Amino acid sequence: KTDRKEEKKNVILGGICCGLALCVASNLQQIGIQYTTVGKAGFITALYIVLVPIFGIFLKKKAGVRIWISVAISVAGLYLLCITDKLVLAKGDILVLLCAVVFTIHILVIDYFSPKADGVRIACTQFFITGVLSAIPMFLFETPRLSDIFAAAVPVLYAGVLSSGVAYTLQIVAQKDADPTVASLILSLESVFSVLGGWVILGQKLSIREIAGCILMFSAII
């Protein structure tokens, strides 16, 4: 009974903490991306690959030399992949940078709670908290209409079910046995797959710079 109570406590507390972090990070990203380029937003958001090992130092989770080398290679790859103009910080960039900080906290919170409770239950609690908290500003600052929701049904369902539901659940389950810095490096491949997806699905052309960025990022993970 004691173990069940402890696990239930960790599910609720972990779900609340993860949900709060995910809500803040997602909203900062979505607001910030309106005031910056997609490339810069992708690069700055993925800076959690640097922030996670830095924050980990204060939590007594020091990363080895090989990990830091991988982080450096990955950042270089991200820069080639995402940045096409000068990196000058604007209003949107600062919001996205704050988003990267909160995503760092999200990864570390998952690292703390995932070994202590069932990952799927934590994920379900996380999504409930994120949904409720995100609904508040939606009704305060937006005018949601069913016609608009139905018009965007496909991207909304994809983002809700696959990009959020499946992906974040797998993240929590997988981080039970994964180092947070390694997890952040793997998660940063999102930028690579988005570019490759545009090439395969949308027929977009890849520049030599982007190909080099993809190679560097895959090399960093390996």
Task: Indicate residue ranges for each PLM-predicted region.
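Hydrophobic transmembrane alpha-helices of multi-pass small-molecule transport proteins
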Residues: 63-83, 99, 103, 134, ...
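Helix-helix packing/entry segments at the starts of transmembrane helices
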Residues: 41-47, 110-131, 164-200
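C-terminal-most transmembrane helix of multi-pass membrane proteins
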Residues: 1, 152-154, 188-222
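Transmembrane alpha-helical segments that form core, pore/gating elements
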Residues: 52-53, 88-142
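C-terminal transmembrane-helix exit sites in multi-pass transporters
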Residues: 48-69, 192-211
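Glycine-/small-residue-enriched transmembrane alpha-helix faces in small-molecule transporters
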Residues: 1, 17-20, 24, 28-34, ...
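Specific transmembrane alpha-helical segments of multi-pass solute transporters/efflux pumps
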Residues: 2-45, 78-80, 160-178
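Membrane-interface helix-cap regions at the ends of transmembrane helices
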Residues: 1-8, 54, 73-89, 129-152, ...
